[in-house]
């Protein structure tokens, strides 16, 4: 049975670490005996993606935001004219899902890694679907 996370974003373009929310879901699942496998985290939004990247130095996410803003400006002159065309393109750089390994009830990421929600058309409240996959 999937769980759902609601994440409030506060800026038009924003990278938000969701590790603490995922850890809380894992704590609840561990109480039910689920400790090893994978979390499949999915964003059903076309202007908000997910990525796993550097989690220690916040300048990495700031650089990503600046890079995308420079390469895909909001006023580029898109044919899609709803005003958020750049957000659709930016989201495609990240994708709509990540698979997070879990060991002993905790995310088993690399030393510097973190899971990020990548907002491209905020501020909004985003809903993420989290599925728990047991190892065979």
Regions found by a protein language model. Give the residues of each.
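Active-site histidine-anchored catalytic micro-motif
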Residues: 1-136
């Amino acid at each position: 049975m999937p769980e759902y996370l609601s994440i409030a974003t506060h800026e038009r373009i924003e990278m938000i670490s969701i590790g603490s929310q995922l850890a809380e879901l894992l704590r609840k699942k561990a109480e039910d005996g689920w400790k090893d496998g994978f979390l499949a985290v999915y964003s059903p939004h076309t202007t908000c993606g997910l990525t796993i990247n550097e989690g220690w130095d916040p300048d990495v996410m700031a650089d990503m935001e600046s890079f995308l803003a420079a390469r895909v400006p909001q006023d580029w002159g898109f044919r899609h004219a709803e005003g958020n065309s750049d957000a659709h393109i930016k989201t495609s750089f990240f994708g709509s899902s990540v698979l997070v390994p879990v060991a002993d009830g905790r995310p088993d990421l690399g030393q510097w890694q973190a899971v990020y929600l990548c907002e491209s058309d905020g501020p909004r409240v985003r809903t993420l679907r989290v599925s728990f996959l047991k190892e065979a």
